[in-house]
């Protein structure tokens, strides 16, 4: 099966669907290299054509809000699309609600993407990791590689789009947005969000909001 998934097959599928290279590889691997079935696989996942749409201007959209049970956590989020018609549609509104709940469930998330994280945060994390005792005595090249892996892991923890989707942990938020874009036929972008916590800055007993929000999505 692996031999059938050649670079040419991947390129051809990418040209036909506009899907990302890794998505094309996954589709071909899942369908034993059958291009037609791979296209259907991508369509079912909502991935086909989503990549081609990602470069188009998304100036419409909506600002969504979510207030967690007990009114202790609130979220405002802006998600953009290309047309007001799509912004009013059920699929876009569902995405808006789902990602709002995701933010509420992820108190450690501060940025939309890892690219949004300021360089000073990256440098601070590097300094912390380089100073850890478990790196003592390791060759410099190995130390750099270990530190890089740890930093990347930490940066992903800070980025909304890298989080496992609370309703389906097999998807990241980025993949959820990409699937929605493919299904509605427009570019969709999460632009910004703000998370409010009642009594923030005051020493209070903390609860597991992530577990509470996740439990609300079940049943």
UniProtKB/Swiss-Prot annotation:
<keyword id="KW-0648">Protein biosynthesis</keyword>
<protein>
    <recommendedName>
        <fullName>Elongation factor Ts</fullName>
    </recommendedName>
</protein>
<comment type="similarity">
    <text>Belongs to the EF-Ts family.</text>
</comment>
<keyword id="KW-0963">Cytoplasm</keyword>
<dbReference type="InterPro" id="IPR018101">
    <property type="entry name" value="Transl_elong_Ts_CS"/>
</dbReference>
<keyword id="KW-0251">Elongation factor</keyword>
<dbReference type="InterPro" id="IPR001816">
    <property type="entry name" value="Transl_elong_EFTs/EF1B"/>
</dbReference>
<comment type="function">
    <text>Associates with the EF-Tu.GDP complex and induces the exchange of GDP to GTP. It remains bound to the aminoacyl-tRNA.EF-Tu.GTP complex up to the GTP hydrolysis stage on the ribosome.</text>
</comment>
<dbReference type="Pfam" id="PF00889">
    <property type="entry name" value="EF_TS"/>
</dbReference>
<dbReference type="GO" id="GO:0003746">
    <property type="term" value="F:translation elongation factor activity"/>
</dbReference>
<dbReference type="InterPro" id="IPR014039">
    <property type="entry name" value="Transl_elong_EFTs/EF1B_dimer"/>
</dbReference>
<dbReference type="InterPro" id="IPR036402">
    <property type="entry name" value="EF-Ts_dimer_sf"/>
</dbReference>
<dbReference type="InterPro" id="IPR009060">
    <property type="entry name" value="UBA-like_sf"/>
</dbReference>
<feature type="region of interest" description="Involved in Mg(2+) ion dislocation from EF-Tu">
    <location>
        <begin position="83"/>
        <end position="86"/>
    </location>
</feature>
<dbReference type="GO" id="GO:0005737">
    <property type="term" value="C:cytoplasm"/>
</dbReference>
């Amino acid at each position: 099966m692996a031999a059938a998934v050649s670079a040419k097959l991947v390129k051809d599928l990418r040209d036909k669907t506009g899907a990302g290279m890794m998505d094309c590889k996954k589709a071909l691997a899942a369908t034993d290299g059958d291009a037609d079935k791979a296209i259907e696989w991508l369509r079912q996942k909502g991935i086909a054509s989503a990549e081609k749409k990602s470069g188009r201007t998304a100036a419409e959209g909506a600002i969504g809000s979510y207030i967690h049970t007990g009114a202790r956590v609130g979220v405002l989020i802006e998600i953009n699309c290309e047309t007001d018609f799509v912004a009013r549609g059920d699929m876009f509104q569902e995405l808006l609600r789902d990602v709002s709940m995701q933010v509420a469930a992820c108190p450690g998330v501060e940025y939309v993407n890892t690219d949004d994280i300021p360089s000073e945060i990256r440098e601070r994390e590097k300094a912390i990791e380089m100073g850890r005792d478990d790196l003592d005595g390791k060759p410099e090249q190995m130390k750099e590689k270990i530190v890089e892996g740890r930093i990347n892991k930490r940066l992903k923890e800070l980025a909304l789009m890298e989080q496992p989707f609370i309703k389906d942990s097999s998807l990241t938020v980025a993949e959820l947005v990409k699937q929605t874009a493919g299904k509605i036929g427009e570019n969709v972008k999460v632009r910004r969000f703000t998370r409010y916590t009642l009594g923030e800055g005051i020493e209070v007993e903390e609860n597991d909001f992530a577990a509470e929000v996740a439990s609300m999505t079940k049943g």
